[in-house]
Amino acid sequence: MTDINNLFFELIQVAIGTRICLSHTPSADEWGELYAMAMKQSLVGVCFAGGQKASPQPSPEGMGEKSLLFRGDLEEAYIPEMLYFTWMGMAVKIQQRNETINRQCVELQKRLSADGFRNYIMKGQANAALYQCGVKNGSVSSKGSSLSALRQSGDIDVYLEGGLDRVLAYARTFGEVKKVNELEMSVPVFSETVVEFHYRPFIMRNPFKNRRLQAFFQDQSEACFTNRISLENKAESLEIMAPTIAFNLVHQIVHIYHHFITEGVGLRQLMDYHFVVKHEMEVEKGSSVQEVKKVISDLGLERFASAVIWVIGYVFDPGMLATWIQKSETTLWKPNEKDGRLLLDEIMMSGNFGHTDERAKDILTSRWKAFWFVNSKTFRFWRFDHWAWFWSPVWRVYHFLWRKMKGFK
């Protein structure tokens, strides 16, 4: 890892409360790089929280333009004024967006339930609710806010009980359904927010592993349909139905792996998983550890999970990583540094869902380019799944034919 990468990780750690201060005072150029990295990884709001001990001060000599002074517990760090206000503006927009999506999640679930569909919200706002570490000494809003309000939200992913045909028929009552795949469909519920109706929580392309995964989801379904969690909104108390921690531990590791060997995965997904693991170990007291380890073993993802555990420890909580290495029985999987560094290098290159990965810039222009790009990754990362090189292209061909037979685009 480069020095700027390590400084970026320190900024994240300060934001989430696992570090007191940065190891050195960033220069104006370094602050610019940190902001660019936060943008690339979709962590703009969370990283801004790392600087929430700010107070206006005169610019020190040699810094050039007027700056704002950040006082950490052990040091001072300067950030250029224009960059600060740009960053703060992004953070405020993220807060406002989260407030909107929180209300939309509640509204959507009320409608689905009234129409006879048991459901639960996956990822997104359900993950944000686990961001329990508060921002110290104020926030981007005058009333203060926890990190959950600063997590960059995307679309709304909601699982509906009933299977493809029933869910699709219902989705069409909202308007034209333009995209249907093996998991989900895009439904025009809200004009400003993409909503995905899932008729499966997720899949694996290996049919034998997928059978085991679907069995796990089915076993967890009753608990998920009744698992009520609270969302943070300024002036109102909001609740949604969301997956259990055991469900999240399996579902999100499979989700991370899928995006890792396709377009790419970013640190936002790893931060989500960090808070899922933190909740399991600190709140649930490890009650699901043995069950989750068994399922991940059955899915053949133990080695990948060990890489993920190393990454979330190294990036988000180095102190906890040291404990996990010394006492591997206290965590889900023993951290694997060699594989973890490989995974982290890919994460830093690809960014959030690979949107800034120069290696993948042509995959949206050609299905064949996308096909070969993904298949080449299954060979490169053979260590994590010895049969992905076979099942990935087989599944993609099958899925293409399935969509054509169903009349889906």
Please report, for each region that a protein language model flagged, where it lies by residue.
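Conserved NTP-donor binding/palm subdomain of two-metal-ion nucleotidyltransferases/polymerases, i.e.
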Residues: 1-52, 78-137, 149-154, 159-409
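Intrinsically disordered, low-complexity segments enriched in serine/threonine/proline/glycine
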Residues: 55, 67-69, 77, 139, ...
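Glycine-biased, low-complexity coil/linker segments
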Residues: 59-63, 71-72, 144
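Cationic, low-complexity basic patches in intrinsically disordered or flexible, solvent-exposed regions
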Residues: 58, 67, 133
